[in-house]
Amino acid sequence: MIQEILYDCKIDRTRQPAMFSAASGDEARPLLVGLHTWSYNHTDYYKKFAACCEKYNWNFIFPEFRGPNWWPEACGSDFVVSDIEDAVRHVCQIANVDKKRIYLCGGSGGGHCSLLLAGRRPDLWTAVSSWCPISDIRYWHEQCRAMDLGYYKHIESACGGNPETDAAARKQAMVRSPISWLPNAAELPLAINCGIHDGHAGKGTVPVDQSIFAFNVLAAPEDRISWDDAMYIVRNETIPEHLHCREVDPAFGEHKVLFRRVSNNVRLTIFDGNHDLYENAALEWLSRQVKGEPISWEPGPASAALDPESSQLTS
């Protein structure tokens, strides 16, 4: 049963809240760390994760990690990293966790944080599933200003100024950006997913080039997506003909996979969707990953598909 808990956080010796549920039985079971979105906290968006974890009989924690991302202690800070480390430690102390199967998943602001933790603490995770993530805080600040989205004010509040004009704020933005840390995740199985219409009016707040640039950090040089192709995808909400994908993934249901590429240990999927996270599809892929074993990149079953209206995120 899901419950709200407090757990000890070492960085400032406070107790921070989280939603938590333990797997049943005496057998060691996987742990999923789920992450809230940009403007929310541990009381939002956890129920879909919790339902999936109940189905799989996984341990589950959904930490606060300092709340909405307009606070300096939030938005990819050292507090965030330390609190999530402590969340994993806490569950491993109070529940029977299979240490070879500790997973991380989040979308939007949780996508940002999942990529950040992939880069800053790759040793913690068996695999990471990131959806509609922000990979470059300074660049997203620029994008939000251009789209007249108030998230740029959140970034300025968290970073202590405008990262486009203030050197100290720019440094903060880079430290809080996954793109600065992702090279550390070269050995970690990482699935990055984004809807092609994200970042367009009424369809989402994070343009797909944020996912593309994260993929490019970890991909082999010959597999990286060019700047021109990335800008074409963002502007036109379609895939260039020479990049069209023929792979079918039933786990995405009616949201057709438009582009998919695997390189090294990272996979990028661009699907016909908006600012979405498909929890069942995410957990089905994670469930096949075991530390020390080959990565499973096969498409998922149709049984993993969700109702398309059930997983649209609010940043």
Give the predicted meaning of each segment.
Residues 40, 92-94, 100-149:
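Primarily recognizes the serine-hydrolase "nucleophile elbow" in alpha/beta-hydrolase
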Residues 75-95:
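Alpha/beta-hydrolase active-site loop
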Residues 26-29, 34-73, 137-138, 200-202:
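Short substrate-entry loop that stabilizes the transition state in hydrolases
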Residues 1-25:
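N-terminal cap/lid segment of alpha/beta-hydrolase-fold proteins
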Residues 44, 126-127, 133-134, 138-184, ...:
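Mobile cap/lid helix-loop segments that gate and shape the active-site cleft of serine hydrolases
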Residues 192-194:
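Short beta-strand/loop motif that positions the catalytic acidic residue
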Residues 260-313:
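Catalytic active-site module of serine/aspartate enzymes centered on a nucleophile-bearing elbow/loop
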Residues 163, 196-264:
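Active-site-adjacent alpha-helix of alpha/beta-hydrolase-fold enzymes
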